[in-house]
């Protein structure tokens, strides 16, 4: 396994791999890896002979300087996990090599409609930072495939749209959310939960799953279902940040043409913000929206 921190050195290695006819699968991460990330690696290994993982805590997608400072840095442990998983190359650039002129002078990429709604309203600039770094990493790595988790549903939708809009020759591989035995979606943030919070945390997925059943039943207006779900979470000690039920393709309001809806959940448990989502197939014979 190679660990490369220099973009030019990476370019040279990529050129060599391309000359050899090797296909490349790419997994971009910000480190602090868990089993969910390793599932992305496995998905890449099913597609290509060479798997490259980047570990880069991207300052452009943080709109809170303290969050950036506090983000866990576990490089040694991450590299051990990736070596054991059979990753071929780990790319670990410094911010100065990715943004040599600083963030304010950096050209950026933005997918306007998908980036400015839902999570984008709560975190201004976050998705612009995400799409910019993913675009730059795609240019450096030149992958044939790129693997993204479905847990970050809006991020996945934005990356798909960016690749389509810009004509990138990359196949995006969505990978199902990995869950703990209790149903909680795996996340780097779960390690911040106290023992008591870890006992409460699975309720987020349980409420979401019941919400999915109720959405499919189509007997109650979506706004009422959302309010009821928020009350259940708040009464259990969560602080509901946002619950949305939107068209799974457009991320806009569900309408009579929507084939699938996605339930997007975000709630604080103590200081930790947990997210989850679930796609629901719609039957419009009796939809209440």
UniProtKB/Swiss-Prot annotation:
InterPro entries attached to this UniProt entry: Pantoate_ligase, Pantoate_ligase_C, Rossmann-like_a/b/a_fold
Catalysis performed (reactions): (R)-pantoate + beta-alanine + ATP = (R)-pantothenate + AMP + diphosphate + H(+)
Localization annotation: Cytoplasm
Cellular component per GO, a single term: cytosol
Location of the active site: 37
Function description: Catalyzes the condensation of pantoate with beta-alanine in an ATP-dependent reaction via a pantoyl-adenylate intermediate.
Additional notes on this entry: The reaction proceeds by a bi uni uni bi ping pong mechanism.
Name of the molecule in the record: Pantothenate synthetase
């Amino acid at each position: 396994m190679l660990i490369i921190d220099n973009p030019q050195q990476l370019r040279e290695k990529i050129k060599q791999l391309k000359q050899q006819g090797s296909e490349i699968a790419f997994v971009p991460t910000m480190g602090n890896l868990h089993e969910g990330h390793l599932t992305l690696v496995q998905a890449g290994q099913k597609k290509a002979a060479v798997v490259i993982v980047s570990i880069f805590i991207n300052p452009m997608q943080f709109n809170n300087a303290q969050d950036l400072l506090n983000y866990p840095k576990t490089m040694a442990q991450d590299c051990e996990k990736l070596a054991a998983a059979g990753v071929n190359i780990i790319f670990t650039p410094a911010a100065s090599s990715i943004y040599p002129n600083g963030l304010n002078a950096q050209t950026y990429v933005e997918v306007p409609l998908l980036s400015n709604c839902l999570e984008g309203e709560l975190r201004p600039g976050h998705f612009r930072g995400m799409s910019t770094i993913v675009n730059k990493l795609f240019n450096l790595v030149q992958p044939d495939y790129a693997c993204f988790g479905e847990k970050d549903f809006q991020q996945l939708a934005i990356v798909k749209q960016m690749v389509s809009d810009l004509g990138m020759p990359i196949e995006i591989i969505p990978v199902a959310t990995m869950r703990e035995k209790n149903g909680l979606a795996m996340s780097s943030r779960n390690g911040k939960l106290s023992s008591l919070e870890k006992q409460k945390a699975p309720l987020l997925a349980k409420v979401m799953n019941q919400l999915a059943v109720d959405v499919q039943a189509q007997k109650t207006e979506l706004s009422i279902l959302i309010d009821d779900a928020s009350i259940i979470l708040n009464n259990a000690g969560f602080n509901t940040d946002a619950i949305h039920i939107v068209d799974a393709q457009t991320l806009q309001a569900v309408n009579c043409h929507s084939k699938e809806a996605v339930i997007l959940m975000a709630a604080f448990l103590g200081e930790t913000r947990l997210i989850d989502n679930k796609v629901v197939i719609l039957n419009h014979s009796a939809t209440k929206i």
